[in-house]
C-alpha cells in the first residue's frame, strides 16, 4: 500500500546563505525586484533525498532557517518509514531574479529529540506542524502504524517559548476523536482552526474526510475525546484513491489516481467557493508526470510574491524511489 502528509509554513524573505553556500547576493547590485519570486522550475531537493523513498514533509516557521521533517525509509534500507529532518536554503536575487536552492540533512538537538519521541519500529508517516494561537502551543501531528498494520493519527504538543524542555515532558497521544478501525492519516487543519481534514479508507478506497473542531483553545480535549462526526468531502473525492489533503487559504491540493490524469497519482487542487469545495482541477504537465506525484505541501515567505509547493515524485530524474521536489505556485491564479 502506498502511503504518504503536511506543511505549515511562514518564513522570512531573502535568505542569504553563507558558510560554504553558493547562494549569495552582492551588496553593490541595484534592487530591480522588490519581492522575491519562487520560480516555476522544478527543483530536486537532492541534498536531503536518498536512494530510498522520501516524502511526507512538514516545515515549521523559523526565521532564517527552514528545517523540514519528512518520512523516509532510508534508515531501514527500505523496510520502514521514520520521521527525519532535513534543511533547505534558498535565495532570490533582487538584481537579476536569479534563484538558487540548496539542501542537506539537519542535525539539531530539538529535532533529534522530536524524532526519538515519535519513531518506533513501525511506520511513521505524514508529519504536520501547527501553532495554535488560541492556547499558545505548537502541535506535531503524524500517523503511526498500529499492531494490526493500519495507520492511526497521533500528536504531541510543546511550548514554542521553550521547545526543547517542554518537549522532554511530552509524549505522543492517540487522536481518539478521529481514529477508526481503518487507515487514518495525513491530517491538516484549516486557517480558522474549525475543521480538520484527513485521509481514511473505511469505504475501501482512500477518501478525503473532515470533522468539525470544537473550541480550539481546548483542542487537546477534543482530539482525545469521543469519536467526532466524520464526513466525506464529496465534491473532491472520486471512486478511486484521493488522499493527502493540504490546505492554504481557500486552496486544497491533494493526490489522486483517478482516471484522466497524466500518470499514476497526480496532484489536483480544489477551490473553496460559496461554502463548498469545487470540482478538482489537475495541476497539469508542468508538475505532474507519467509517474507518481504525491504528498503536496504549500509554503510561503514574507516578501515573496508567490508561494512554493513541495511534493514527492518517483520520476526517473530523482536519486531513487520517491524524492522531494520544490516549485513556485501562484495561489491567486489557482483561485480564479
Feature locations, PLM:
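Bacterial Sec-dependent N-terminal signal peptides
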Residues: 1-31
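Short, conserved micro-motifs composed of acidic
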Residues: 25-336
Amino acid at each position: 500500500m502506498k502511503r504518504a502528509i503536511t506543511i505549515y509554513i511562514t518564513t522570512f524573505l531573502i535568505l542569504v546563505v553563507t558558510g560554504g553556500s553558493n547562494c549569495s547576493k552582492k551588496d553593490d547590485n541595484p534592487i530591480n525586484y522588490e519581492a522575491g519570486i519562487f520560480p516555476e522550475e522544478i527543483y530536486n531537493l537532492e541534498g536531503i533525498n536518498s536512494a530510498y523513498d522520501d516524502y511526507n514533509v512538514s516545515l515549521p516557521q523559523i526565521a532564517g532557517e527552514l528545517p523540514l521533517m519528512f518520512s523516509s525509509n532510508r534508515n531501514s534500507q527500505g523496510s520502514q518509514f521514520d520521521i527525519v529532518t532535513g534543511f533547505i536554503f534558498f535565495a532570490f536575487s533582487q538584481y537579476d531574479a536569479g534563484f538558487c536552492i540548496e539542501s542537506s540533512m539537519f542535525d539539531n538537538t530539538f529535532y533529534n529529540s522530536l524524532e526519538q519521541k515519535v519513531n518506533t519500529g513501525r511506520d511513521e508517516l505524514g508529519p504536520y506542524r501547527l501553532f495554535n494561537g488560541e492556547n499558545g502551543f505548537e502541535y506535531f501531528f503524524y500517523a503511526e502504524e498500529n499492531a494490526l498494520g493500519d495507520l492511526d493519527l497521533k500528536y504531541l504538543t510543546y511550548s514554542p517559548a521553550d521547545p526543547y524542555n517542554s518537549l522532554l515532558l511530552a509524549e505522543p497521544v492517540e487522536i481518539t476523536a478521529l481514529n477508526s478501525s481503518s487507515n487514518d492519516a495525513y491530517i491538516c487543519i484549516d486557517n480558522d482552526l474549525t475543521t480538520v481534514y484527513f485521509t481514511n479508507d473505511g469505504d475501501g478506497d482512500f477518501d478525503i474526510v473532515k470533522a468539525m473542531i470544537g473550541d480550539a483553545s481546548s483542542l487537546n480535549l477534543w482530539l482525545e475525546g469521543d469519536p467526532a462526526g466524520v464526513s466525506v468531502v464529496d465534491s473532491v473525492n472520486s471512486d478511486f484513491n484521493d488522499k493527502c489533503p493540504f490546505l492554504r487559504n481557500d486552496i486544497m491540493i491533494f493526490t489522486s489516481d483517478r482516471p484522466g490524469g497524466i500518470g499514476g497519482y497526480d496532484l489536483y487542487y480544489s477551490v473553496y467557493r460559496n461554502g463548498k469545495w469545487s470540482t478538482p482541477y489537475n495541476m497539469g504537465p508542468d508538475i505532474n508526470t507519467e509517474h507518481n506525484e504525491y504528498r503536496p505541501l504549500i509554503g510561503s515567505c514574507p516578501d515573496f510574491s508567490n508561494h512554493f509547493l513541495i511534493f514527492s515524485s518517483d520520476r526517473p530524474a530523482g536519486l531513487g524511489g520517491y524524492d522531494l521536489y520544490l516549485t513556485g505556485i501562484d495561489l491567486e491564479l489557482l483561485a480564479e
